[in-house]
Regions:
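C-terminal binding/interaction regions
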Residues: 73, 114, 118, 122, ...
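Short glycine/serine/threonine-rich phosphate/pyrophosphate-binding segments
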Residues: 8, 78-83, 107-108, 127-137, ...
Length: 208
């Protein structure tokens, strides 16, 4: 977010020279264009909703509700953060489905979709305002829930601090919370959980 276009271009060039893909988060349109101008021979892809820049194509098409991760948002204003999490997981080869606009202001919307969450191994819940969605969700489902406070809101909710404090003070045991607007961090937490599950399955099979 605070790196210059020149610094980002240098990092991408070093990754390219090593044959490694790269994902850069918190990149706006102007900076993405500036980086692309500095690297004319690179096939960079800017993902405007997620505000990310990748050195390889990343597709989010065709993801269904059977994906191992489901990302929920309280409202459509949370979409950029949810998309950042979804893209970060896709970059790692993990499919994540989106379930938007299921905030606690209309709790019936979440309750009627609970059956769709059964196949997910990890849930990421993005919410602004008072940030209640992750707490409510963690009280309803057995899967790991990762809460992402979002900076949308007004009054005392402005900036996401109220949502962060609410999630940290949650009475739902085991709720994981990342920093404000940190969709990428939530994705990496989900990836670690999935990696542990996979390693345990492999270990168990090895013992057989």
């Amino acid at each position: 977010q605070h790196k210059t276009a020149e610094q980002i271009a240098a990092i991408l060039e070093s990754f390219h020279n090593r044959g490694e893909p790269a994902l850069v988060t918190r990149v706006d349109a102007a900076k993405a264009a500036a980086v692309a101008a500095l690297l004319p021979g690179h096939d960079l892809q800017w993902h405007h909703q997620a505000r990310c820049l990748s050195s390889v194509p990343i597709s989010l098409d065709g993801i269904d509700t059977a994906a191992p991760v489901t990302i929920l948002s309280g409202g459509t204003s949370d979409l950029p953060v949810a998309k950042e999490a979804q893209l970060a997981l896709a970059f790692q080869g993990i499919a994540a489905s989106l379930m938007l606009d299921v905030g606690v202001a209309g709790l019936h919307r979440l309750l009627e979709r609970l059956p769709l969450l059964r196949s997910a191994q990890v849930l990421i819940a993005c919410a602004g305002m008072e940030g209640a969605l992750p707490t409510v969700l963690a009280g309803l489902v057995p899967q790991p829930v990762i809460g992402v406070p979002v900076s949308v809101g007004y009054g005392v909710s402005a900036g996401g601090r109220a949502a962060l404090d609410g999630m940290l003070a949650s009475c739902a045991p085991g709720l994981t919370v990342v920093n404000i607007d940190n969709g990428y961090g939530a994705a990496m937490a989900a990836l670690r959980i999935l990696s542990c599950s996979t390693e345990r399955v492999v270990a168990d099979r090895g013992e057989e």
